[in-house]
């Protein structure tokens, strides 16, 4: 029984993920000192942060051997041109091929997108060669 518990605990620890903001990431000298290699690290999209700081955080994480997965909040994306720009920046500057799609914290959309499904239906992530998309659902709203 103890062996099964230890195996379960080990698998649980090996498969967890964590979320950072560019600001919090700036306080960490090396992620290798605080996280196991290959950990998936979600990068929160903070509307008052510029997209370049989020892309730089993703690049740093990927360069250090982690799986950067930035947030794409639908309601904060003005239009397809902005979505294309963000996808291109993450893909070409940071080597990102995974993303977390969510509606976002705004109650009303800033532009053309209201939900994560609309981001998927745009086809932009497929066109860019993204390999994995996660979707966040908040039944109570987000």
How should each PLM-predicted stretch be described?
Residues 2-142:
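Active-site beta->alpha loop and helix N-cap motifs at the rims of alpha/beta catalytic domains
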């Amino acid at each position: 029984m103890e062996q099964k518990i230890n195996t379960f605990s080990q698998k649980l620890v090996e498969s967890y993920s964590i979320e950072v903001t560019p600001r919090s990431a700036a306080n960490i000298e090396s992620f290798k000192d605080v996280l196991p290699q290959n950990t998936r690290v979600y990068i929160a999209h903070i509307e008052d942060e510029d997209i370049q700081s989020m892309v730089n955080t993703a690049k740093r994480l990927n360069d250090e051997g982690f799986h950067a997965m930035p947030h794409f909040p639908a309601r904060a994306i003005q239009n397809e041109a902005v979505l294309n720009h963000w996808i291109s920046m993450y893909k070409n500057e940071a080597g990102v091929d995974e993303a977390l799609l969510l509606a976002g914290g705004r109650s009303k959309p800033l532009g053309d997108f209201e939900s994560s499904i609309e981001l998927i239906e745009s086809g932009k992530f497929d066109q860019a060669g993204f390999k994995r998309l996660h979707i966040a659902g908040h039944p109570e709203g987000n």
